[in-house]
């Protein structure tokens, strides 16, 4: 299993990138957002990968963070959602947008992804709504693994230091949401209720304290 690639970017296609790792070129399929965040040609890039294995096909899919990769794996666990549909959802909504839409049961947002019809969007929401909180809670821990992801390339110690690896879009948001979700669960709120409150609060709050306060207001008993 290939879980991560670190190499030099040879080129970017419409839906994939070619990464040179020690003289071997790997074709890695990525979402539009991931492709847009990659560095310039010739610079060092690191992607977390998921390998799709079929009888007549081997395909690598790349992600800027382990958190994004986990969401891809969760999405593809839904019947009818292949890697292409998952990439479309993540490319259209981003990780945070997809998490928010699923947690709040917003099938319309999921349907905005190219190739995702209303029935499939509804199935995604229904099947993943209860599973989303667990992945959301992993966000902060997984994103910590992004630190220092670009190591020195073998045999290139004398080369100029590579440009810093681009971070995943909205990484601080996923970290804050994971921390807020964990805090609410520690206060006794159920995973599903806590995740819905955090997802709603994220529309107007960004850092952890703000998210917790806003979520608690949403969870407070209505008079």
From Swiss-Prot:
<protein>
    <recommendedName>
        <fullName>Holliday junction branch migration complex subunit RuvA</fullName>
    </recommendedName>
</protein>
<keyword id="KW-0233">DNA recombination</keyword>
<feature type="region of interest" description="Domain II">
    <location>
        <begin position="65"/>
        <end position="143"/>
    </location>
</feature>
<dbReference type="GO" id="GO:0005524">
    <property type="term" value="F:ATP binding"/>
</dbReference>
<dbReference type="GO" id="GO:0000400">
    <property type="term" value="F:four-way junction DNA binding"/>
</dbReference>
<dbReference type="GO" id="GO:0006310">
    <property type="term" value="P:DNA recombination"/>
</dbReference>
<dbReference type="InterPro" id="IPR013849">
    <property type="entry name" value="DNA_helicase_Holl-junc_RuvA_I"/>
</dbReference>
<dbReference type="GO" id="GO:0009379">
    <property type="term" value="C:Holliday junction helicase complex"/>
</dbReference>
<dbReference type="Pfam" id="PF01330">
    <property type="entry name" value="RuvA_N"/>
</dbReference>
<comment type="subunit">
    <text>Homotetramer. Forms an RuvA(8)-RuvB(12)-Holliday junction (HJ) complex. HJ DNA is sandwiched between 2 RuvA tetramers; dsDNA enters through RuvA and exits via RuvB. An RuvB hexamer assembles on each DNA strand where it exits the tetramer. Each RuvB hexamer is contacted by two RuvA subunits (via domain III) on 2 adjacent RuvB subunits; this complex drives branch migration. In the full resolvosome a probable DNA-RuvA(4)-RuvB(12)-RuvC(2) complex forms which resolves the HJ.</text>
</comment>
<feature type="region of interest" description="Disordered">
    <location>
        <begin position="148"/>
        <end position="177"/>
    </location>
</feature>
<dbReference type="GO" id="GO:0048476">
    <property type="term" value="C:Holliday junction resolvase complex"/>
</dbReference>
<feature type="region of interest" description="Flexible linker">
    <location>
        <begin position="144"/>
        <end position="171"/>
    </location>
</feature>
<dbReference type="InterPro" id="IPR036267">
    <property type="entry name" value="RuvA_C_sf"/>
</dbReference>
<feature type="region of interest" description="Domain III">
    <location>
        <begin position="172"/>
        <end position="223"/>
    </location>
</feature>
<keyword id="KW-0234">DNA repair</keyword>
<comment type="function">
    <text>The RuvA-RuvB-RuvC complex processes Holliday junction (HJ) DNA during genetic recombination and DNA repair, while the RuvA-RuvB complex plays an important role in the rescue of blocked DNA replication forks via replication fork reversal (RFR). RuvA specifically binds to HJ cruciform DNA, conferring on it an open structure. The RuvB hexamer acts as an ATP-dependent pump, pulling dsDNA into and through the RuvAB complex. HJ branch migration allows RuvC to scan DNA until it finds its consensus sequence, where it cleaves and resolves the cruciform DNA.</text>
</comment>
<dbReference type="InterPro" id="IPR012340">
    <property type="entry name" value="NA-bd_OB-fold"/>
</dbReference>
<dbReference type="InterPro" id="IPR000085">
    <property type="entry name" value="RuvA"/>
</dbReference>
<dbReference type="InterPro" id="IPR010994">
    <property type="entry name" value="RuvA_2-like"/>
</dbReference>
<comment type="similarity">
    <text>Belongs to the RuvA family.</text>
</comment>
<dbReference type="InterPro" id="IPR011114">
    <property type="entry name" value="RuvA_C"/>
</dbReference>
<dbReference type="Pfam" id="PF07499">
    <property type="entry name" value="RuvA_C"/>
</dbReference>
<feature type="region of interest" description="Domain I">
    <location>
        <begin position="1"/>
        <end position="64"/>
    </location>
</feature>
<keyword id="KW-0238">DNA-binding</keyword>
<dbReference type="GO" id="GO:0006281">
    <property type="term" value="P:DNA repair"/>
</dbReference>
<keyword id="KW-0963">Cytoplasm</keyword>
<dbReference type="GO" id="GO:0005737">
    <property type="term" value="C:cytoplasm"/>
</dbReference>
<keyword id="KW-0227">DNA damage</keyword>
<dbReference type="Pfam" id="PF14520">
    <property type="entry name" value="HHH_5"/>
</dbReference>
<dbReference type="GO" id="GO:0009378">
    <property type="term" value="F:four-way junction helicase activity"/>
</dbReference>
